[in-house]
Amino acid sequence: MARIAGVNLPAQKHVWVGLQSIYGIGRTRSKKLCESAGVTSTTKIRDLSEPEIERLRAEVGKYVVEGDLRREIGIAIKRLMDLGCYRGLRHRRGHPLRGQRTRTNARTRKGPRKAIRK
């Protein structure tokens, strides 16, 4: 089991799939990382040699991933809320940000229904 960016990658999966278990790496970036590290993307993680794992670590290290990315996103949202702009207010209230309707639907963002008090 290889450990990259503080995440244990599942040994039985292909490299390009396993890299996606790192927060901030999706399909496209995963395949580009394999290509730039010189690793065949369809190789299983358990079959990687130590130099290949090191090359992957170096390539992943060039991107903001995991805790640093989560922190950056949190800071960006907090900045919007502190500014008091429309998007910040929507974050603060827990409503959808991008113009979706809220009269019906939007339950995922708003949470479960609140009981009506009389």
UniProtKB/Swiss-Prot annotation:
GO terms for biological process: translation. InterPro entries: Rbsml_uS13_C (IPR027437), Ribosomal_uS13 (IPR001892), Ribosomal_uS13-like_H2TH (IPR010979), Ribosomal_uS13_bac-type (IPR019980), Ribosomal_uS13_CS (IPR018269). This is Small ribosomal subunit protein uS13. NCBIfam families: uS13_bact (TIGR03631). One of its GO terms (molecular function) is rRNA binding. Located at the top of the head of the 30S subunit, it contacts several helices of the 16S rRNA. In the 70S ribosome it contacts the 23S rRNA (bridge B1a) and protein L5 of the 50S subunit (bridge B1b), connecting the 2 subunits; these bridges are implicated in subunit movement. Contacts the tRNAs in the A and P-sites. It holds the Pfam family Ribosomal_S13. Belongs to the universal ribosomal protein uS13 family. The gene is rpsM. Residues 92-118 are annotated as: Disordered. Part of the 30S ribosomal subunit. Forms a loose heterodimer with protein S19. Forms two bridges to the 50S subunit in the 70S ribosome. PANTHER family: 30S RIBOSOMAL PROTEIN S13/40S RIBOSOMAL PROTEIN S18, SMALL RIBOSOMAL SUBUNIT PROTEIN US13M.
